[in-house]
Amino acid sequence: MNPYEAERKNFPPQPETTFSDSLSAFKMAFFLRQPSMTAQIGIDLGTTNSLIAQFINGETRLIPNRLGHFLTPSVVSIGDDGKILVGLAARERLRTAPQSTASAFKRFMGTDKTFKLGNKTFRAEELSALLLRSLKEDAEAFLGEAVDEAVITVPAYFNAIQRQATRNAAQMAGLNVLRLLNEPTAAGLAYGLQEKPDDTRFLIYDLGGGTFDVSVLDYFDGVVQVSASAGDNHLGGEDFVQILRQCFLRQCKELSDAERAKLSDSSELWQALETAKRKLGEEMQAEIAVNVGGRIVSAVITRNEFYEAAKPLLTRLRQPLERALRDARLHPDQIDSIILVGGATRMPLIRQTIAQLFRRIANVSVNPDEAIARGAAVQAALIARDESVDEVVLTDVMPFSLGIETSTDLGNGERAYGIFSPIIERNMPVPVSREERYSTASDNQTEIELRVLQGESVAAKDNLELGRLTVKIPPRPEGEVYIDVRFSYDINGLLDVDVRNSEFDISANQTFRHNSVNLSEEEIQASLKKLAALKIHPRDQHENIYLLEKGKRLYEEHLGDQRQIIGHRIMIFERILESQDHAQIRRAQSEFAEFLSHYDGGWLL
């Protein structure tokens, strides 16, 4: 039976209801420690640096590491004696022993990428576990008591697998995760309690070392309410360093290919580039000099050259901003304050760009490096019902849409398969429960296989599969058997899928715990790496590719009925391209372009 043979019917959605449940995390065998009722902390598990904080006596305080610093570099190394080094010591070895040191591994959480440190191999979550264990030990040494529970922050745009990988890392480190808190939400919580703004709508601009998130929040009567979130998990301060690397190598024409290849992994060059990036924030130019085979190779990079080369990154930063504002149905002028979070927001280039986009100076009352950890500590105190914390209610939203794979009728007896049908759309407040109705797509079906998906693409194959649920149905003519599919999602990431049809006594239920537990690791990674492939024939022509990509972008940007209409028109245009009828394709191009123009307002930012 074709797994796609369910068709969405345009019945009105059922009223939303709340859904709440808890998830007991599975036990891990690494770094064994027994959990106990002890101090709760907040952890900002960052790409470049990590921090710990605790809420005590009515305020948040940062917890120093073993060297007395609040910022712990997110770097892990194996020393010459075979022992694990974490933090500042490990960061020093990026230059002296790069073959035994790993950094920026947060970017690869939930993937199958491995890091070779000496003769040992680690996954990103294993390296994160080593980092978390070090942070846990620092907290225990400072507080003088066991620490077994923590609120850990993650990028708002982390998907289910990345979130589960973070939980796994915590379990390996001997930490029970009280909650995974979205980073911009944590920053908003810290800002709300510190500033106590009255009826304020603010935007959190969170640019860290490796990830970028933006969230729109409202603060009123002690409530911090997230209206919309968007982001890019592969965009951060590290990418601006890479831009400088390209500028440097472009000037150093005397370098051989072998020398360039060696420099690509040079920690000495990375440190020189990082220094130059900061210097360009204060001066008009910076010199970058490194030792290559016993000789000094140098180049001078001007601020204008750097800013010009960084324009593509600024464009990428702009896209999540537009999506968050669009989903919140707000114009930039309706934002009362912009809060900067993350060390990369210290770059003057970023602050100037924000000032130009919003026509105002961003708020820096909360330390960009500390806000997320402080917010996590507040959340830990709220969970522990600490009486010293001000009464505050926090609501968050879905970062991604959840739905199933279906087919759709294109008319004239044609049907398109592999279509994503959202049930819970992104940026809906959680906990949430919604229901949609689907019917059979062919005669005498005996079962419907529901592929549960997370993502925004109109093509089901381009979204992340969380699992499958097979529903037995009586054989009947096409469309006579329907099923009501209810998705219920809670704040802990627990998804309950319930299928019902009282007329035919159909019922099925399955709970998906954070990620696709029914899939192998190989299948999970394959689903993450799938990309849309344009077919040959007219599809490879520039105009057609442009229109299809524009349609996909607009589908991802819109919600509800508009999203369904756009998705349907994409399917029709693709079907016309496959016909290879050039006259029909030319007419369709004009009509499709005009159709898309109605949904591409272009007024935002």
For each predicted feature, which ranges?
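Short N-terminal leader segment in a subset of presequences, especially plant chloroplast
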Residues: 9-11, 46
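Oxyanion-binding/catalytic loops of NTP- or PPi-dependent enzymes
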Residues: 26-111, 115-121, 130, 137-605
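Cationic, low-complexity basic patches in intrinsically disordered or flexible, solvent-exposed regions
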Residues: 8, 15, 35
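Aromatic (phenylalanine/tyrosine) cluster motif
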Residues: 4, 11, 19, 24-26, ...
